[in-house]
């Protein structure tokens, strides 16, 4: 029983508050309890005052008592609101700290791409942005007010016991029944069902198409304006229909709630009135009991339920993610220090790897992306990897960077399993540019060398990447900052390339480029790739690209299909072979109807 209670997300939410800020949490609970009992105390104070007036006694003490309680009722509310707001902010910060640590601390990235963790990660990440409910700084006040009313209702019921033991039970039972009767319909009304959320997403999508700048060009060019308006109207109408249907769901529960509450209150107030009329209770007692009977209504169903549910869900999500992310992103780290560069070769030996499967629903591995994969890359050479989407090209890049480890087989550097190297040592020897590279809202210097580097290295990397005149090193790459600037997609790609070249200058001996020039123009691509090969001529370079005008310059080209090497050789060898590489190369060439012998100067535009 106790275990079931402590496993509830509401319990976990309240348990987190003192961890986030112990003094503030203590103050929040103290003021909450005071506010909860003050309505009952005020009822007693008014009864004492009325009794004193009726009996002709001194009014000084009763008035002072009633005045003090009244002042506290007025003063404690704004104080509690301020405490709630601060505690909500501290709790949100505590949760974000825990979430950030849980996401960043594991050395791999499996926990960030595991579909079984996606739902919790989304809830935990977005909870305080106002997307799924009010931020904690606001919802804490709703929760506080709801709990004050609950405590006030219980305190009022306790006073009413003195009149008749059954009276508080009757009233409390009627008001508590509203929680059971209205909860499910309230969840529907608050758009917490999948159907309502789906309709909201559909309507929001059409709305964003209409008002957001990125879609404005195509919207007008292809004449989608009318379609967008019609789509928004239909989806929004559907959403309103669902909301209306949800409101109709409340009709029967509301009727039953009204009948129960009215019946219980009629019985209690009628008997109180008769007792007062017959003189069985005094006027002062009648005032106390009437106010207490009214106070019991504070335990009725209200905003407390949905506010607590919305605040408790992300807490439970973060607490679930912490232990789940650690093993999902775990990687073994050895003790050997990696050499600056491979001396003989990089070998992927009998490597099998699969990502966690959504279909299995357990985080177990799904279909293998690479199966018994073998590939040897001579040290100091350049290898281009090509293939259709899903062939496993980017997966190889992730494995070489040790963002994942294979389920079987090994990646060996000069015969040494890469898992035997110290993880940080190995990664310092790898310079990588991924398709979704970082765009840091930091100065240009820190974008090129996030871990720090002499300005000479930073400037040299920018020159080699064709970004020498991009901006001053201290310029923040975001317009939101004073003196900041924004960059185009191609300019950002040059910064990412400069980051890799700076890593090479700092000692990296393996260069991994995943679509490194996808956002550059034709002339810029040819220029940058020639520079890259020149700057990394002493390194082992792995290039992943769909542009055959780029990959043809590599020492060797590897064609992947369904996680296996189907062709391997130089550009000339693969063209002479007449296999898949030749087919893909000719397919790009035919789009421009250019003779093959001119391909080296014209295919740069293809992607």
Language-model features: where?
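Membrane-integrated ABC transporters
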Residues: 1-39, 61, 80, 117-119, ...
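ABC-fold ATPase nucleotide-binding domain signature/coupling loops
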Residues: 121, 368, 467-495, 499-516, ...
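Transmembrane helix-loop-helix hairpins at lipid-water interfaces of multipass membrane proteins
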Residues: 26-80, 150, 154-186, 263-287
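An intracellular "coupling" helix at the cytosolic face of ABC transporter transmembrane type-1 domains
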Residues: 9, 15-23, 125-139, 192, ...
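Conserved post-Walker A segment of ABC ATPase nucleotide-binding domains
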Residues: 338-340, 388, 397-460, 526-538, ...
């Amino acid at each position: 029983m106790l275990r079931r209670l402590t496993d509830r997300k509401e319990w976990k939410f309240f348990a987190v508050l003192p961890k986030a800020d112990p003094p503030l949490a203590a103050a929040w609970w103290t003021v909450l309890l005071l506010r909860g009992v003050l309505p009952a105390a005020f009822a007693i104070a008014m009864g004492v005052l009325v009794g004193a007036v009726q009996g002709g006694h001194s009014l000084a003490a009763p008035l002072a008592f009633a005045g003090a309680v009244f002042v506290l009722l007025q003063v404690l509310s704004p104080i509690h609101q301020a405490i709630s707001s601060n505690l909500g902010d501290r709790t949100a910060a505590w949760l974000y700290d825990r979430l950030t640590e849980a996401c960043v601390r594991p050395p791999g990235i499996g926990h960030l791409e595991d579909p079984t963790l996606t739902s919790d990660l989304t809830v935990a990440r977005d909870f305080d942005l106002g997307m799924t409910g009010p931020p904690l700084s606001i919802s804490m006040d709703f929760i506080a007010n709801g709990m004050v009313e609950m405590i006030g209702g219980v305190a009022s019921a306790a006073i009413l016991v003195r009149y008749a033991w059954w009276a508080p039970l009757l009233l409390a039972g009627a008001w508590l029944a509203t929680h059971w009767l209205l909860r499910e319909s309230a969840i529907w009304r608050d758009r917490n069902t999948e159907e309502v959320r789906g309709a909201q997403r559909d309507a929001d999508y059409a709305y964003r198409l209409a008002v957001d700048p990125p879609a404005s060009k195509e919207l007008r060019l292809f004449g989608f304006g009318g379609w967008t308006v019609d789509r928004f109207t239909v989806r929004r109408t559907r959403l309103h229909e669902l909301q209306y249907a949800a409101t109709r769901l409340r009709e029967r529960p509301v009727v039953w709630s009204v009948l129960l509450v009215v019946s219980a209150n009629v019985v209690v107030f009628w008997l109180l009135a008769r007792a007062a009329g017959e003189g069985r209770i005094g006027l002062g007692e009648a005032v106390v009991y009437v106010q207490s009977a009214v106070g019991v209504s504070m335990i009725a169903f209200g905003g407390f339920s949905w506010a607590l549910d919305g605040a408790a869900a992300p807490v439970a999500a973060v607490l679930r993610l912490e232990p789940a992310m650690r093993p999902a992103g775990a990687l073994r780290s050895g003790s050997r220090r990696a050499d600056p560069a491979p001396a003989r070769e990089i070998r992927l030996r009998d490597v099998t790897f699969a990502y966690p499967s959504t279909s299995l629903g357990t985080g177990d591995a799904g279909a293998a992306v690479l199966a018994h994969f073998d590939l040897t890359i001579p040290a100091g050479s350049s290898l281009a990897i090509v293939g259709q989407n899903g062939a496993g090209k980017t997966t190889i890049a992730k494995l070489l960077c040790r963002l994942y480890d294979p389920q079987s087989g090994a990646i060996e550097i000069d015969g040494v399993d890469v898992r035997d190297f110290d993880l940080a040592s190995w990664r310092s020897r790898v310079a990588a540019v991924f398709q979704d590279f970082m765009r840091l809202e930091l100065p240009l210097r820190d974008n090129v060398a996030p871990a720090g580097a002499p300005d000479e290295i930073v400037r040299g990397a920018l020159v080699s990447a064709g970004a020498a005149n991009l901006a001053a090193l201290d310029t923040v790459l975001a317009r939101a900052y004073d003196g900041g600037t924004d960059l185009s997609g191609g300019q950002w790609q040059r910064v990412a390339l400069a980051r890799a070249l700076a890593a090479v200058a700092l000692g990296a001996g393996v260069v991994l480029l995943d679509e490194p020039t996808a956002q550059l123009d034709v002339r810029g691509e040819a220029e940058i790739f020639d520079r890259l090969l020149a700057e990394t001529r002493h390194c082992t370079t792995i290039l992943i690209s769909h542009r055959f005008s780029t990959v043809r310059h590599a020492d060797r080209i590897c064609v992947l299909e369904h996680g296996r090497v189907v062709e391997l050789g130089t550009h000339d060898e693969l063209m002479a072979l007449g296999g898949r590489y030749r087919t893909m190369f000719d397919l790009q060439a035919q789009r421009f109807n250019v003779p093959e012998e001119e391909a080296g100067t014209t295919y740069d535009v293809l992607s």
